[in-house]
Amino acid sequence: MKRLFPVIVCVIFGCQGDIVEQNPYLNNLPSFEFELNLDLPLYDNLRFAGGTLTLSQLGFKGVHLYNLDGSQILAWEASCPNQRPSDCSKTIVNGIEAVCSCDDSIYSLVTGQPLSKDVEYGLVNYGVRRTGNLVLVY
């Protein structure tokens, strides 16, 4: 028991939770659920790998959808993650990147990570569930 006690103490105090740094510019994003049917012509671009679509009615400044590989769809908040909300703090899709209108910072639609230097926060990710041609964004 004497040998087991130090091991237990090390395990208990050695385990720390992951530290998640909250983006101070985008901490109160609206919650939503939106279902789309890829059979409809409006969403046809999302049926193929590399396809993108921006839904301006969702999220804070809109939601960018990106078809990663023909089956997996990713969803990102369209707000610039390193800017206070303003008239120009929206990202615009350019291929597989999102570019901030305010400072021209570039973000990957594949990972959400910034591609520009000296940028602290990446794009905010939304959940996506796909069942056949029905896609739920939340």
Placement of each model-derived feature along the sequence:
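Sec-dependent signal peptide recognition
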Residues: 1-7
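C-terminal motif of bacterial Sec signal peptides marking the signal peptidase cleavage site
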Residues: 11-14
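N-proximal short alpha-helices
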Residues: 16-19, 101
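N-terminal pre-ligand scaffold of iron-sulfur
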Residues: 18-95, 108-109, 124-138
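Short cysteine/histidine-rich metal-coordination sites, predominantly Zn2+-binding motifs
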Residues: 94-104, 114-124
